[in-house]
Amino acid sequence: MSANKQKKLSTMEVDPNEDVSSSSEDDDDDEPHPDAYKGNEEVQIDFEGRAPVDPDAQGISQLLQRLFLRAHINCNQMADLIIAQNFIGSVICQCDDEGTESETEDDNMVEDGTIFGITSVLNLTAKKDQPSIAQLRTYILDRAKTHASPEVQQQLKEILDSEQRHVGFLINERFINIPAQISVPLLQSLQQEIEAAKAKKMKYDFGTLLLLVKFYRKESKKGKPGEDVYTNAEDELLSDRAKFSFEYSMASETDSGMSGDWLEGDAVMTPYRKLLVLEAKKLPQLIDDIQRFINGE
């Protein structure tokens, strides 16, 4: 998906309880806004996917920061890596209502548009000497040491240490309340781009994919079972399909991705992360499973 060939994804009905144009400073404001979302409101937005380009760097970095929070990972440098391989992956942006009439107008839309999501993959094996990738590898192993079983720690170390079977870090981040169906064309496009790169003998022949997903846990109370709510609905299915995984609480860190004005009576949920270990060869099947999951099949 080249930068100058946008692919319309679909029209989404989005709950506007997150101000997509707000700054990170606004995320820390806990006071309810007089115009806060009151529930049962919908806004229709047309989204499209296109290749990431240089002006997207800040938006991609902010999405990565929401995933890693206070982790010592250089999200700016990671965003640059994603853009440098712009033949792989897509960003989500809003369609131009008036249509694109010229390359100049297209360039202006790219420069001025908000990035609503990013779907891509980074090679943790081939790029292990890049600062942000080295930091990510350390982060994963450190979290596993604290929160995973000894067996999972050992398996994860062996996977990351292997030079023969490359490991891809799958990135599937978007603003909350953008429905899960948008993930299918993005992941399908990513799979096609990976296959095209493999055909050119590029380093995208992965044995394993790692995916870090966000979810929130409503703790059990008064005999009621706990409940996990995934930020991206499809991540619940991927979690079930993972070869193995481990999770950890982010309660001590502020998750700006879910900040905003809560509905009165909503329970405050504890933010978590879960690292999923997926077999790369099963990605096409996983995408089909997501489609059926979305369709309620």
UniProtKB/Swiss-Prot annotation:
One of the record's GO cellular component terms: nucleus
Disulfide bonds: none
GO molecular function annotations of the record: protein kinase regulator activity
Origin superkingdom: Eukaryota
Region spans: Disordered: 1-40
Family according to the record: Belongs to the BCP1 family.
Protein name: Protein BCCIP homolog
